[in-house]
């Protein structure tokens, strides 16, 4: 089982997430017999520090989370406006997703791996399509509570997926201003993908979800244009509607 561990802190509580490849709790987890594979899911654990409580949430189905067949991981969790926001990051097609209905979700057959390879968090299996086929869009999932049921999914084509990347780390780039407006930043990490069809042509930028809204508004800022062509690794909310960005120093 290959796992990616995610962690988000909330005052005296902690949420941890595990992206797993064999989640029996996931509905319809078993793949077609010929693949001998299972669907990916995200297991959420709630830890309360002072009360010393640990609760395991139901496994969230990771496959086809966005309706394009790809599985996702979550880059950060944000509490704002009595909701929970997260940025689902498409990771490509698992062996299960690639084989589903004779390759229904495969846009680029040449990207499907013909043998096992890679190492550590970049390892892959034969039959897998590694990394997303949709680099020119970003998604946000909005949940009503910590049970992580029935999310509202919203999409924008103004930025690429919303997370910073450093090896196996997926950094949160979705933050709320003091007035509840949620700003979604993208460093356009997909620019460095090897395959041209997996590279984004969108610059690093930021979009916004107004407080209480369930869709993006018209706000957009081209961060690369303002920085002379540079992108960033991470970002944080500071105060009001001010944010701190850890910029790259070269193009």
Sequence positions of predicted segments:
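C-terminal motif of bacterial Sec signal peptides marking the signal peptidase cleavage site
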Residues: 17-22
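Acidic/polar, low-complexity intrinsically disordered N-terminal segments immediately downstream
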Residues: 25-93, 145
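Repeated scaffold domains used in trafficking and secretory/extracellular systems
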Residues: 29, 36, 67-79, 163-174, ...
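Beta-propeller blade signature
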Residues: 48-55, 101-149, 198-214, 251
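Beta-propeller fold detector
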Residues: 50-69, 116-118, 124, 150-160, ...
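Short coil/turn segments that connect the beta-strands within blades of beta-propeller domains
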Residues: 81-82, 179-181, 240-242
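Loop-centered beta-sheet repeat module
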Residues: 134-209
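Long, well-ordered mid-to-C-terminal structural blocks that present hydrophobic/aromatic surfaces
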Residues: 184-251
